[in-house]
């Protein structure tokens, strides 16, 4: 079975665009996502470009903060502290991987839980494993939505998920 995600992606974007339209009525401004990109890894640059394009398409204000690979951990943490304190910033995304001299766990934990759009904050990960409400990591959430919307029956089936991401909850945990 081959499943195409194009229709689902289009439907998700349309729904998100409608939700974004109502945001200013409630908050007096557009939602604002800030992506922090450290270094010039080609894959990361491409991924961030895709994220900002998707945000633009649905009307989300977005800012990319680009820093050189030799930024200090202290400088990066200061940027996160400033974003956490900024009430006009609704979501923070740190593009991974970070350079080896920066502790990714420390950086991710520094983001306020409610501004963590990736679902990688330790409290979001803990809530996920405990099946509590939380920000769900997008990849397993997307997999489960795609399977569900495609009518794939998962009950009684077994699957193996091989994941090399920062955090790797199974798609089952995101259903």
What are these regions (language model features)?
Residues 75-86:
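Short, well-structured alpha-helical segments in soluble
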Residues 56-67:
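Short beta-strand elements in bilobed, periplasmic/extracellular small-molecule ligand-binding domains
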Residues 93-159:
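Anion-binding alpha/beta catalytic cores of soluble intermediary-metabolism enzymes, centered on
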Residues 166-175:
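Single conserved hydrophobic/aromatic residue that forms the stacking wall/gate
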Residues 19, 45-58, 168:
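Short, solvent-exposed amphipathic alpha-helices that sit
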Residues 1-25:
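Positively charged, low-complexity intrinsically disordered leader regions
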């Amino acid at each position: 079975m081959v499943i195409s995600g194009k229709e689902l992606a289009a439907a998700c974007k349309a729904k998100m665009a409608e939700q974004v339209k109502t945001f200013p009525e409630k908050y007096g401004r557009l939602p604002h996502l800030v992506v922090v990109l450290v270094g010039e890894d080609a894959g990361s640059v491409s991924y961030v470009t895709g994220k900002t394009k998707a945000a633009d398409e649905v009307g989300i204000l977005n800012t990319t903060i680009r820093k050189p690979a030799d930024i200090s951990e202290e400088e990066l943490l200061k940027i996160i502290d400033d974003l956490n304190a900024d009430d006009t910033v609704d979501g923070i995304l740190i593009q991974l991987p970070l350079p080896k001299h920066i502790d990714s766990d420390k950086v991710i934990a520094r983001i306020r839980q409610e501004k963590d759009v990736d679902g990688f904050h330790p409290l979001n990960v803990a809530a996920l494993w405990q099946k509590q409400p939380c920000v769900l990591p997008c990849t397993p959430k997307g997999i489960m939505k795609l399977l569900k919307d495609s009518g794939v029956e998962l009950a009684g089936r077994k699957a193996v998920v091989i994941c090399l991401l920062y955090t790797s909850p199974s798609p089952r945990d995101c259903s």
